[in-house]
C-alpha cells in the first residue's frame, strides 16, 4: 500500500448553488414582476414557449466607454466591405446579394477566406499589419490616403512653417534683448540719480553739522564771557565791602580805662574756669 494523499476538507456554504435569492419571494424584484402578472415558474418573454427561464447574467462594466463605443471601434477595424464584425447573419445576406448581382462565386470565396481567418485568429490570435499603414499617410479630415506628392508638399510647407517659427523666435529673442538693454539703461540712470541725491544729502548734512558746531561754540563762548563778567562783578563787590569793613575797624577807638580793666578781669576769669587745676586749687580740692 502506498502513502495516503493529503486530506483536503471541502467546505460548503449555506447556499452552494446560489438559489436563495431567486427563491426569496420577499425581494423587491420578485414582487414587482408579480404585479405585472408574472408568476413563479414562468419565464421572461411575451410568448410562454420562447420565454427565458435561465438566470440573466449581468456583465460588469470596467471602463468609461459609452453605449455603442465598441461597435464603432469594430467598424473602424473592418478589412473590406464584407467584414461583418459581430453582426450575426450578415454573411447570408451578402450571399443573397451576390446571387442577385451575379457575383455569387466571388462573394463565397471572400466569405470563406474570412471564416478561415477567424478560425486562425481564434487559435493563435495574431493580427498582421502592413508596413505601409504604419506611415502617416492617412488623412483624418478627408478620410483618405495621402499621395506622395501631397506628402512632399506637406513636408515643404512644414519646413516653411518651421522657418517662419524660427524667424518669429529670433524676432522675439531680439525684442527681449532690446527690452533688457533698455531696462539696464534705466536702472543705471536711476542708480546714478540716486547716488547723486545721496551725495547731495550727505553734503547738506555735513554743512548743517558744521553750522551747528559753530553755533554751539559761539554760544559756549558767550556763556563763558557772561560768567566771567558776573564773577568779576562779584569780586569787585566783595573787595569793596572788605575795604569798607577794614576802614571801619581802622578807626581809632577811644576805649576807656575802666572797660579795659574789666575786659582783662573777664578774660582771666574765663581762663580760670576753663582750667580744671586752677579750679581745684581755688576750691582746695585735692586729688586724694
Curated annotation (Swiss-Prot):
UniProt biased composition (Acidic residues): 157-166
InterPro entries: G_patch_dom, PINX1
Record protein name field: Protein PXR1
UniProt KW rRNA processing keyword: yes
Biased composition, class Basic residues, residue ranges: 169-185, 195-214
Protein keywords: Nucleus, Ribosome biogenesis, rRNA processing
Biased composition annotated in UniProt, kind: Low complexity: 238-256
A GO MF label: enzyme activator activity
Record PROSITE patterns: G_PATCH
Family recorded in the similarity comment: Belongs to the PINX1 family.
Organism lineage string: Eukaryota, Fungi, Dikarya, Ascomycota, Saccharomycotina
Cellular component terms (Gene Ontology): nucleolus; nucleoplasm; small-subunit processome
A Pfam cross-reference name: G-patch
Organism from which the protein derives: Candida glabrata (strain ATCC 2001 / BCRC 20586 / JCM 3761 / NBRC 0622 / NRRL Y-65 / CBS 138) (Yeast)
Subcellular localization(s) per the UniProt record: Nucleus, Nucleolus
